[in-house]
């Protein structure tokens, strides 16, 4: 059974949380690289901060993914690798 926010014992308005969105090079977890990370930190319905960066996946972006996301190989080529991005995201 899936738990609800009521199960936390804290009203949702008092909970600080982050919503994270990833764009990747494909659909299978073992064969993909991250091309973009976006995050929003929220508390009580207020935005406390945002984070967004392109990520160099170290692999080619298939044309179908470029059509879907608008992210091209040229856009991610100068971007940092995921190893460099994660510490900044976790701050």
What does each of the following model-derived ranges do?
Residues 1-91:
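Conserved non-catalytic scaffold segment of RNase H-like nuclease domains
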């Amino acid at each position: 059974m899936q738990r609800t926010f009521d199960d936390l014992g804290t009203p949702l308005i008092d909970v600080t949380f982050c919503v994270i969105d990833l764009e990747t090079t494909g659909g299978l977890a073992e064969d993909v690289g991250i091309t973009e990370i976006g995050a929003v930190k929220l508390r009580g319905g207020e935005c406390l901060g945002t984070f967004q960066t392109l990520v160099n996946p170290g692999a080619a972006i298939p044309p179908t993914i470029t059509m879907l996301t608008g992210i091209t190989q040229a856009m991610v080529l100068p971007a940092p690798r995921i190893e460099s991005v994660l510490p900044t995201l976790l701050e």
